[in-house]
Amino acid sequence: SYAVDINELNWEYGPTKSSIGSKAKIVIPEGYVFLGKKDAAKFMELAQNIPSHKEYIFAPEDLSWFAVFEFDSVGYVEDDEELDTNSILETLKRGTEQGNIVRREKGWGTMSIKGWEFKPRYDKQNNLLEWAILAINDTDNSEIINYKTRILGRSGVMKVVLVADPLELTSSINSFKHALVGYDFVDGEK
């Protein structure tokens, strides 16, 4: 176990450019920060989230929200596929229940998925699939909203989870999408 302060992480401060593995590149604008894989895993632990050790973190400097990027090499995904929203929600609930087992082992609070904040929809302008899940922190009953995005690429999808205060969700999504203009798959993944 390690004890690390969030300020001790190796933050990359904008304006700069960075990579998300070998699949994508991102421009970090002024006022934003980025963490590579090693420090992103530490950040996830500090935020009491289970790290995959494949994620990257992008956020405004004040950390009023943060986005977790992780590539999933599922192959090409059609943007016109019919979505079974009930099946997606059940899969998310099962994943949360499995995650709660690990959270309990670590002495962290658990969470429960309440339902959709909004159902999956395709954003043609930004070539991404998006939805938002409303969850409850089981310890203090506070609401949590995870805005999830799938940016479609040639050999898979970039999974992005935006973690934000429910009261700030709309402004956080707008800020995130505005900053996302600096994201692009590398050649061969577009």
Predicted regions and their residues:
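Soluble periplasmic/extracytoplasmic beta-strand elements of cell-envelope proteins
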Residues: 33-35, 68, 159-161
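Non-catalytic surface loops within mature trypsin-like serine protease
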Residues: 22, 30, 73, 164-166, ...
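Short aromatic-glycine motifs in intrinsically disordered, low-complexity regions
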Residues: 14-27, 167-178
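Extracytoplasmic/lumenal ectodomains and periplasmic regions of secretory and membrane proteins
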Residues: 135-190
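Conserved polar/disulfide-associated segments of primarily extracytoplasmic proteins
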Residues: 4-17, 21, 25, 39-146, ...
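Short, surface-exposed beta-strand-loop junctions and turns on beta-sheet-rich folds
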Residues: 34, 41-42, 166
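Short conserved aromatic/hydrophobic patches within beta-strands of well-structured domains
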Residues: 30-36, 182-183
